[in-house]
Amino acid sequence: MSTGNFDLNELKRRMQGATQALKHELGGLRTGRASASMVEPVQVEAYGSHMPLNQLATVSVPEPRLLSVQVWDRSMVKAVEKAIVDSNLGLSPATEGQVIRLRIPELNQERRKELVKVAHKYAEQARVAVRHVRRDGLDTLKKLEKNHEMSEDDQERLAGDVQKATDSVISEIDQLLAAKEKEILTV
């Protein structure tokens, strides 16, 4: 019973990568109090590539509803400001020299609904990533079976295992989304 070069654990690890990315993105959708992690997902167009904000500035929380972004390179202030505005976090930057202040607005019902939509978008991106991994795995299984490196029975059994892993990770994504949606909508 040979399974060729097929590693189900590697496929599961890649699927979990999508879940980890989703957790990171959902962590940026904060409600209520200011947190430096709110701006973690912000990518800045800098030095010819996209860079995370935390590689260009120091983010601090001087007050419960205020973030302070100290940009290290004066020439990057406008790029950081633009990235924050474009990030769909609903934050309006106020710049003073190399410091960008971000007031965290009280969340009204409309803004909560916008945040839920953003969370749904992130979750759908994660689901699509998981489905791509599933497709890669199933394609690999078909090739192994076609090249007689695996029996048809083994291919079908492993395809079922791939589907079970996919269903499990998609279910985890749905649970993460439901928890974040509840957190956002709780007044």
Swiss-Prot record:
Please report any disulfide bonds recorded for this protein chain, giving both cysteine positions: none
Q: Where in the cell is it found?
A: Cytoplasm
Look up keyword Translocase and say if it applies: no
Which is a Pfam family this sequence falls into?
RRF
Q: Which InterPro entries match?
A: Ribosome_recyc_fac, Ribosome_recyc_fac_dom, RRF_sf
Keywords noted in UniProt? Cytoplasm, Protein biosynthesis
The record's principal subcellular location, in a coarse class, is cytoplasm
| GO CC, any one term | cytosol
Please give the biological process terms from Gene Ontology that the record holds.
cytoplasmic translational termination
Coiled-coil annotation reads: none
The UniProt GO MF terms for this protein read: ribosomal large subunit binding
Primary role: Responsible for the release of ribosomes from messenger RNA at the termination of protein biosynthesis. May increase the efficiency of translation by recycling ribosomes from one round of translation to another.
**Family from the record:** Belongs to the RRF family.
Q: Which PANTHER family would you find in this protein's record?
A: MITOCHONDRIAL RIBOSOME RECYCLING FACTOR PSEUDO 1 (PTHR20982:SF3), RIBOSOME RECYCLING FACTOR (PTHR20982)
Q: What is this protein called?
A: Ribosome-recycling factor
